[in-house]
Amino acid sequence: MSARLKVVHVGKFYPPYPGGMESHLATLCGELVDDVDLRVIVAHDGRETVSETVDGVPVLRIGTAAWISSATVNPGMAAAIRGSGADVVHLHHPNPTGVLSYLASGSRAPLVVTYHSDIVRQRVLRTLFWPVQHRFLRRAHAIIASSPDYAASSPVLRRHADRVRVIPFGIRPDDAGTPDPATVAMLRERYGARVVLAVGRLVYYKGFDYLVRAMDSVDGHLVIVGDGPMHRELERLAAEQGIAGRVTLAGRVDSVASHYAAADVFALPATARSEAFGLVQLEAMAAGLPVVNTQIPSGVPFVSRDGQTGLTVPPRDPAALAAALTRLLDDVGLRTRLGRAARERVSTEFSAERMARDTLALYHEAAGRPMPAIPTSRPE
């Protein structure tokens, strides 16, 4: 029997550090750790380098010497990649620090890249990084896109279309945790019987300002779980519209699962391609919630399909958002049917097990090794 592949993941950060890329990386590595010799190399938000094991996954957090805008400077990362002895390097992008460290490492291991999103808003960084990014992507054996929609709409991925493989992101059934019945009952009593839930960082591309405006004409209570720089702006907007009593900015919560269980409808009113996939949609769908999302050129409307698992409306359109939310809140039969289909779609199309299996096959292809037989289900 041949030795297991040694796979090194290079990311930005790793949980408990929050973020969509970080959540995906943890889910994927949690599924792969029994099938490959796995190690994760990421930045540490402190100056020291820390080696630890997180939920069975070996993680090396390289000390940060400085920050340039939102990017870290980690002088030890290139040496860590070079000394890893990897059979395959899997880098999660956009990640300027990881890309520069990989190129500086001189690694000759086959490269797999998960392309989480384009660099959208940081125009200076995008311009300066453009030639380096394409040099890096030309080195890749394969570039994973999370949806066919994003692969088709990204100018970067179109330039490297011959290397692009679509492997949708997946989740485990318990990724959001387990709802606590007492907490669910308390939330229902607090917010009432018509609850619209949104989850995410309070940043511009989530479109939460349009969602707050929409609630002016929706009979229901909006709960937004998450924090970020737009908190005060959203509070002010709700107050100006006279609906502060029906809009709750909950911040970070102990039990996201309980909030999903207490909600009737989930909303992701994204306005920009920075929202490349919308993993929170999967969590909501797994909880049996129909989704109201937006028709943006990314994976968002691919995850939850209009008329199948929810309703899709134009971006930046509070009236359309309000109409879709009201339709679902008023029609329990439609809400139940779409929610049931949403749960089934996650189970069949977006499982973490399926994502890991397809990724593992790609590793073996890149390394030129045959794919071993993998049990169809893992023992408990």
Regions from the language model: what does each represent?
Residues 5, 9-19, 23-70:
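N-terminal strand-loop element at the rim of the active site
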Residues 230-233, 244-253, 259, 311-312:
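Active-site donor-binding acidic/aromatic loop of nucleotide-activated sugar
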Residues 290-294, 304:
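Short hydrophobic beta-strand element within catalytic cores of glycosyltransferases
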Residues 305-307, 311-318, 326-333:
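Conserved acidic donor-binding segment of nucleotide-sugar-dependent glycosyltransferases
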Residues 141, 246, 261-276, 289:
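Acidic donor-binding loop of glycosyltransferase active sites
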Residues 91-98:
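Short His-centered aromatic/hydrophobic patch
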Residues 23, 27, 194-217, 229-235, ...:
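A conserved mid-protein helix/loop that constitutes part of the nucleotide-sugar donor-binding site
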Residues 138-176:
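A short, active-site helix/loop in glycosyltransferases that binds the activated sugar's phosphate group
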